[in-house]
């Protein structure tokens, strides 16, 4: 799976894009917005969801059952999330509150458990004094992605019908269009409802590409599709949902097209630090920015080095052990 693609490197780059983008926001500056479309971090999330949809759908096809498939997904998400949640609230949060004994009166245990179950409890009571409130704002995408796993598991691992992804993709396209004109801003499971359809679209676009790979995985087809999408995006710039939807599809298709065209000289399946970088970056950056008071770029560099070290520990001490336990051959799907 790793010899002729660069999915692992792409995920690591996307995780670092989130770190860089968030560093602006956490420092009280506007995040860099690219092409009037999304922040750098937002584009990174699209990359994550596209790759996840592509790889996870293939994992579902190979799985023996829905339970087998979801067990694999749980082993990928929760083992690393548990220590991260504990460190976030019992160490990083405590540091951010000057090691105050009163800090632990703010339902820290409940907040930690909520984080482990991907349902973040309100944390304004422990972070309102920071430049940008929030203890780990990146985790909002996890329940969203896990719901995509469940839908994928039902559609493929249980029904064994890859064609279901076309229907699911069309549903998410429709929901994205409806959400773009709706004034509903309700929140469910800590997620603003309007954020889900477009991210889900990226996931299931990647999944659909995986199911019909033979029809597009040719250099001429890839170049033609990317060129047409890019031209249409340019022509529709400033036209609201028309431009946004085109850009989501363009980023999703381009991500999969590039990753399946380029080899991986860096990672080659040896490790996957991207998840660790993603879940540890936000709280580490909060600590560095709000306690060390360094310059913008030095604090970004220190955050990146610290996060890469923590992700290295997370991979080698936790994640890899649970992934190899499921199979004699390491799988990063």
UniProtKB/Swiss-Prot annotation:
InterPro entries: Acyl_transf_3_dom (IPR002656), Acyltransferase_3 (IPR050879)
Any one Gene Ontology BP term: polysaccharide biosynthetic process
GO cellular component annotations of the record: host cell plasma membrane; membrane
Record keywords: Acyltransferase, Host cell inner membrane, Host cell membrane, Host membrane, Membrane, Transferase
Record membrane topology: Peripheral membrane protein
Localisation per UniProt entry: Host cell inner membrane
Superkingdom in the source lineage: Viruses
Example GO molecular function: acyltransferase activity, transferring groups other than amino-acyl groups
Keyword Oxidoreductase in annotation: no
Enzyme's top EC category: transferase
Matches recorded under Pfam families: Acyl_transf_3 (PF01757)
EC number: 2.3.1.-
Function: Antigenically converts S.flexneri serotype X to 3a, Y to 3b, 1a to 1b and 4a to 4b by O-acetylating the O-antigenic polysaccharide chain.
Family the entry assigns: Belongs to the acyltransferase 3 family.
Protein name per the record: O-acetyl transferase
Organism of this sequence: Shigella phage Sf6
């Amino acid at each position: 799976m790793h010899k002729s693609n660069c999915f692992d490197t792409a995920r690591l780059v996307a995780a670092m894009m989130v770190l860089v983008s968030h560093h602006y926001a956490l420092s009280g500056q506007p995040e860099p917005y690219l092409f009037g479309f999304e922040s750098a971090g937002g584009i990174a999330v699209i990359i994550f969801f596209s790759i996840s949809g592509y790889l996870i759908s293939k994992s579902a096809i190979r799985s023996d059952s829905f339970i087998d498939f979801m067990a694999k997904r749980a082993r990928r998400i929760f083992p690393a999330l548990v220590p991260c949640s504990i460190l976030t609230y019992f160490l990083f949060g405590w540091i951010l509150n000057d090691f105050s004994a009163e800090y632990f009166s703010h339902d820290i245990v409940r907040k930690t458990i909520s984080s482990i179950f991907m349902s973040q409890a309100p944390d304004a009571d422990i972070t309102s004094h920071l430049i940008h409130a929030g203890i780990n704002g990146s985790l909002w995408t996890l329940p969203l992605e896990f719901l995509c796993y469940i839908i994928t598991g039902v559609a493929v691992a249980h029904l064994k019908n890859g064609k279901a992804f076309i229907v699911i993709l069309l549903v998410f396209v429709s929901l994205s269009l409806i959400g773009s004109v709706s004034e509903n801003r309700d929140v469910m499971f800590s997620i603003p409802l309007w954020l889900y359809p477009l991210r889900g679209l990226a996931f299931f676009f990647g999944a659909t590409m995986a199911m019909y790979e033979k029809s597009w995985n040719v250099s001429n087809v890839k170049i033609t599709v990317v060129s047409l999408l890019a031209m249409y995006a340019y022509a529709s710039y400033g036209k609201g949902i028309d431009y946004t939807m085109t850009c989501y599809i363009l980023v999703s298709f381009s991500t999969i097209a590039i990753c399946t065209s380029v080899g991986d000289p860096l990672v080659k399946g040896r490790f996957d630090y991207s998840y660790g970088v993603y879940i540890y970056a936000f709280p580490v950056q909060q600590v560095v920015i709000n306690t060390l008071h360094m310059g913008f770029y030095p604090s970004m560099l220190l955050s990146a080095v610290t996060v890469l070290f923590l992700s290295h520990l997370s991979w080698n001490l936790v994640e890899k052990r649970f992934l190899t336990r499921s199979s004699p051959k390491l799988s990063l799907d």
